[in-house]
């Protein structure tokens, strides 16, 4: 675990730290591990009891000069929410050959395959049915991912040098799975209180709207032009109640989803024929075309150890090619070279400095970044980083780091239509690179009082961004992927036949700064040789600031378009989907072969969310967006106001070593069965019961 942005060896985008995972070499004796788990949700959605479970298998051994590791994993989760499932199978392995002819030389290959069939959950049906997905959220995904990583390592211990070569070929085939509501028109309209004898009246209104509807709604046009829509919406409500007297907003969404599944819509002359044809059973839709993503990667690293220092240089190249039936073919190239120098002074001070040069292009745009060097513009971005660690005394350390970051938008973010939580994840070809820097100052102190020992760590951090990348949720043109932020774009999507989609898109939000404090302590108390208590406590304070909030609020306030979108749910200075305070605690008590433990966490309220979901501003009367939200999400405004007040979640576990090699553990997640949400319409899992059995032999 590397905190802060002090290293250039792991890419230019890791500003807040990273975790480098290394595979353990097999021991002299073969080892097989089997872990089985199964669980059920205590009080989930009402249609049955969804289960989940998984199986992990791994085997490692040495065969003469070969290291062999193979593994398999399967996971099935019905989901505690309707149409929110995950079915995953993974197999992989590692083969390493230690060449006996050359000391310090090893080479081999890692191979991995993943099948993943899943749907997310982003929009609920209503606050009264929070575990049932909206019929508008009808997208899932089926993926097949394969990669093969050849590698070669050579270490000359006499010269203190190491060469590392790594390569990767990666392929992912990804297909959007589209679902439509399985409710019949009869079931939908029956729930809405519809009388079948009203069909001729509806057909007459559709065919003669100039005389049947226009006289009712036209008088409200002056009010609408002045931004007042309550009168018009009142008349629309009366019309809806006339035909659907018992309908809820969720029922209207069922009806809209049913109609959207039977496009193209009729014109005024064939409403009756379209309705008769629409009543017939739908033919099963053909699967969406498969999108393919290919990646080729080559990385080289050379390091030289000196008496008190180490020099590391290297380079990396990655090419990504994406082939989508919707958005076409796109490719990117990323070339980087880096240098890092680490030095240890007077046995107490460790210093690390480095520089990384990045070149990135997408398609034929060869200058995603430009930097002036001696007056000339070159298409590379330099990233400088450095850090130090000083031992103040016994078990007492102070550290500091500073690093620049630069994250290029991926081909997927710019050009590929995907999905998130059952709704569209729309590409944004205008997305720019995010850049910034991070500074951190930390202090770590070990302690020992009798049988208690551990450490306490406190750090302050500051991060500054330019063109920060965040996602926004809203309406989009289904063909051009334009964000709908005005009536003209809305009408254009309808008139052109492009249609509307609901979902999210990555976008640049401007300047931002995030600063705060991270305080934690971990330790263990030994009661006796059979009993010990291990613990971890942590608190994080974060202040996420939108530095352009004043100018953005003024610009949005001046926009009087009825469909004008705002950047977030309130006028505060805070970034979206962040909490200021979070506290966690982990305790594990072991006694002989038994153990009992708990995880506890508390988070404060979410500071701001997307405007398309909630508007927390006070106003004299509802605007058009308020009515639209009520139709799409039910009374989400009041639900969020009542429930966005921070939450506490507690998990418990009890385990036992049955034998030296077999361990059984029972867990209860969300022990208090707390209903909580970190964002609107995302209700956390209810109380969950899990049984795990692990065996090593």
What do the predicted segments below correspond to?
Residues 1-2, 14-36, 55-57:
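N-terminal periplasmic accessory domains that precede
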Residues 35, 346-347, 460-464, 483-612:
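Gram-negative outer-membrane beta-barrel transporters
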Residues 38-42, 63-65, 74-78, 111-117, ...:
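Transmembrane beta-strands of outer-membrane beta-barrel pores
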Residues 58-94, 118-125, 174-179, 305-320, ...:
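Surface-exposed extracellular loop regions of Gram-negative outer-membrane beta-barrel proteins
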Residues 58-60, 73-74, 96-99, 107-114, ...:
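Conserved C-terminal beta-signal and adjacent last beta-strands/turns
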Residues 77-88, 98, 102-159, 163, ...:
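Flexible loop and strand-edge segments within Gram-negative outer membrane beta-barrel domains
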Residues 164-168, 172-178, 391, 397-401, ...:
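Membrane-embedded beta-barrel scaffold of Gram-negative outer-membrane proteins
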Residues 308-316, 320, 328-464:
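Structural signature of Gram-negative outer-membrane beta-barrels, strongest in the C-terminal barrel
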């Amino acid at each position: 675990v590397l905190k802060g942005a002090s290293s250039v060896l792991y890419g230019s985008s890791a500003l807040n730290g990273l975790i480098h995972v290394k595979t353990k070499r097999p021991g002299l004796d073969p080892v097989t591990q089997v872990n089985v788990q199964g669980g059920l949700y205590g009080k989930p959605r009402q249609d049955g009891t969804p289960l989940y479970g998984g199986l992990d298998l791994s085997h490692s051994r040495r065969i003469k000069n070969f290291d062999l590791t193979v593994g398999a994993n399967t996971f099935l989760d019905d989901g505690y929410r309707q149409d929110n499932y995950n079915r995953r199978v993974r197999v992989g392995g590692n083969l390493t050959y230690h060449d006996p002819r050359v000391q310090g030389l090893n080479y081999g290959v890692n191979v991995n395959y993943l099948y993943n069939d899943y749907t997310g959950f982003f929009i609920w049906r209503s606050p009264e049915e929070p575990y049932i997905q909206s019929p508008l959220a009808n997208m899932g995904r089926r993926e097949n991912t394969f990669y093969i990583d050849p590698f070669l390592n050579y270490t000359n211990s006499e010269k203190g040098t190491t060469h590392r070569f790594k390569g990767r070929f990666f392929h992912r085939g990804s297909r959007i799975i589209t679902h439509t509501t399985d409710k019949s028109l009869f079931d939908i309209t029956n729930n809405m209180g519809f009388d079948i004898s009203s069909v001729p009246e509806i057909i007459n209104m559709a065919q003669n709207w100039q005389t049947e509807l226009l006289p009712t709604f036209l008088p409200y046009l002056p009010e609408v032009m002045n931004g007042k829509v309550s009168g018009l919406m009142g008349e629309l409500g009366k019309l809806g109640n006339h035909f659907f007297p018992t309908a809820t907003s969720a029922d209207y969404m069922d009806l809209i989803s049913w109609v959207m599944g039977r496009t193209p819509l009729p014109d005024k002359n064939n409403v009756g024929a379209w309705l008769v044809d629409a009543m017939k059973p739908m033919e099963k839709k053909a699967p969406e075309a498969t999108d393919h993503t290919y990646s080729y990667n080559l990385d080289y690293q050379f390091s030289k150890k000196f008496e008190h220092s180490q020099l590391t240089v290297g380079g990396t190249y990655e090419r990504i090619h994406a082939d989508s039936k919707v958005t076409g073919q796109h490719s990117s190239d990323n070339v980087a070279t880096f240098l890092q120098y680490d030095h240890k002074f007077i046995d107490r001070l460790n210093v690390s400095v480095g520089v990384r040069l990045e070149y990135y292009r997408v398609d034929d745009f060869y200058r995603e970044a430009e930097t002036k060097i001696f007056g000339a513009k070159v298409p590379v971005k330099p990233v400088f980083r450095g850090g130090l660690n000083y031992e103040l005394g016994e078990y007492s350390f102070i550290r500091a780091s500073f690093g620049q970051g630069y994250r290029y938008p991926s081909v997927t973010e710019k050009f590929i239509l995907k999905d998130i939580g059952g709704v569209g994840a729309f590409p944004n070809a205008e997305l720019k690179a995010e850049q910034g820097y991070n500074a951190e100052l930390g202090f770590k102190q070990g302690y020992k009082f009798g049988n208690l020992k551990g450490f306490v760590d406190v750090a302050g951090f500051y991060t500054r961004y330019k063109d920060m990348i965040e996602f926004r949720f809203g309406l989009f043109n289904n063909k051009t992927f334009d964000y709908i932020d005005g009536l003209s774009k809305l009408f254009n999507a309808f008139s052109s036949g492009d249609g509307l989609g609901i979902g999210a898109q990555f976008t640049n939000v401007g300047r931002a700064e995030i600063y705060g404090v991270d305080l934690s302590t971990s330790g263990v108390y030994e009661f006796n040789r059979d009993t010990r208590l291990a613990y971890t406590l942590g608190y994080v304070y974060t202040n996420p600031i939108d530095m352009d909030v004043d100018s953005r609020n003024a610009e949005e306030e001046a926009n009087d378009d009825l469909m004008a979108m705002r950047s977030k749910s309130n006028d505060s200075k805070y970034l979206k989907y962040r909490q200021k305070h979070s506290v966690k605690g982990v305790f594990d008590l072991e006694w002989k072969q038994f153990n009992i433990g708990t995880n506890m966490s508390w988070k404060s309220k979410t500071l701001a969310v997307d405007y398309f979901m909630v508007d927390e501003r006070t106003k004299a009367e509802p605007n058009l967006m308020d009515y639209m939200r009520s139709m799409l999400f039910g009374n989400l405004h009041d639900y969020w106001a009542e429930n966005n007040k921070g939450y506490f979640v507690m998990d418990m576990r009890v385990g036992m070593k049955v034998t030296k090699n077999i361990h059984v553990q029972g867990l209860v997640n969300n022990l208090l069965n707390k209903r909580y949400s970190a964002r609107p319409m995302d209700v956390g899992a209810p109380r969950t019961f899990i049984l795990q059995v692990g065996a090593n032999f």
